C-alpha cells in the first residue's frame, strides 16, 4: 500500500492518473495522508474506477454534485465510477488518514458482458443517482461491511494467494453493497454522471467562483 500526498491528472483533464494501475490486475491500494496535500484537500477529479474507502483516523468531507457528506474515523463508503468529487481534511486534533481500494469492475466481473457484470455490477455503476454509498458505525448492516472493509486492508501483497484473497474480499463487500444499494437503485436519477461537459463546467465554476466576473 502506497502512502500518497498528492493527486495526478491526465493532461488537459480532471481525470485522475493512477500510477501503478495495470491491466493484468486492475487494482491499487493507497493510504492517503490528507493533511500533507496542498491546502489539506484533494481537488475536483473523477476516475473510471470504483473507489472503496475506510477512514483510519480523523475525518474528511466528500463533496459531489449531489452534496456533501462527512466521514469520521471508522466510517467508509464507495464512490461510483465517473463521479466528480473532491475531499477535504476536517479534523484538527488527529491525522486525517484514508485507506483506499481503487479498482476496475473487471477485477470482480471478469469479461465485459459477463453474467456477473450484468446481474451484480452494472445495476450499480450505471445508476446515475448513486454517487456515494456511505457506511457508518451504529447501523448493524453497515458495521458488518465496515468490519470486512477494514480487514481487507490488512491483507499483505507478500502473502501467498494475495490477489485471489483480495478479489474474494472485495467481491464479498460488493455483494453487501449491492444489497445495501437496493433502495437507491429503485429511485430514478436526474443527472448524467458521465457527461464530461458538465464535469468541466462544474470544475471551472468551483475553481473560479471567487474571481471577479468581468
Question: Where would I find each of the regions flagged by the language model?
Answer:
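Ligand-binding loop in jelly-roll beta-barrel domains
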Residues: 82-107, 113-116
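Short, Lys/Arg-enriched, Trp-marked, Pro/Gly-tolerant hinge/linker segments that flank
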Residues: 131-142, 155-212
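Short, Lys/Arg-enriched alpha-helical recognition elements, typified by the DNA-recognition helix
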Residues: 146-150, 201
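Generic protein-terminus/edge-of-domain signal
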Residues: 1-76, 82-83, 118, 129
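Detector for the N-terminal beta1/A-loop initiation region of ABC nucleotide-binding domains
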Residues: 61, 86, 208
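Residues that form generic nucleotide/phosphate-binding pockets
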Residues: 28, 123-124, 148, 155, ...
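Short histidine-centered beta-strand/loop micro-motifs
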Residues: 39-46, 63, 88-90, 110-113, ...
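Aromatic/histidine-rich interaction motifs
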Residues: 115-146
Amino acid at each position: 500500500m502506497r502512502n500518497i500526498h498528492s493527486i495526478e491528472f491526465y493532461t488537459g483533464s480532471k481525470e485522475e492518473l493512477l500510477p501503478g494501475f495495470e491491466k493484468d490486475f486492475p487494482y491499487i491500494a493507497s493510504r492517503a495522508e490528507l493533511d500533507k496535500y496542498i491546502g489539506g484537500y484533494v481537488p475536483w477529479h473523477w476516475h473510471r474506477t470504483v473507489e472503496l474507502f475506510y477512514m483510519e483516523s480523523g475525518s474528511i468531507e466528500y463533496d459531489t454534485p449531489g452534496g456533501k457528506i462527512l466521514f469520521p474515523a471508522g466510517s467508509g463508503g464507495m464512490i461510483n465510477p465517473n463521479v466528480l468529487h473532491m475531499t477535504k481534511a476536517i479534523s484538527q486534533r488527529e491525522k486525517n488518514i484514508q485507506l483506499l481500494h481503487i479498482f476496475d469492475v473487471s477485477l470482480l466481473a471478469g469479461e465485459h458482458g459477463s453474467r456477473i457484470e450484468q446481474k451484480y455490477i452494472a445495476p450499480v455503476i450505471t445508476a446515475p443517482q448513486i454517487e456515494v454509498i456511505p457506511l457508518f458505525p451504529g447501523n448493524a448492516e453497515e458495521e458488518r461491511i465496515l468490519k470486512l472493509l477494514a480487514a481487507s486492508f490488512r491483507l499483505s501483497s507478500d502473502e501467498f494467494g494475495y490477489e485471489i484473497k483480495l478479489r474474494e474480499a472485495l467481491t464479498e463487500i460488493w455483494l453487501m453493497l449491492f444489497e445495501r444499494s437496493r433502495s437507491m437503485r429503485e429511485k430514478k436519477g436526474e443527472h448524467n454522471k458521465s457527461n464530461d461537459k458538465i464535469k468541466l463546467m462544474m470544475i471551472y465554476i468551483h475553481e473560479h467562483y471567487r474571481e471577479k466576473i468581468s
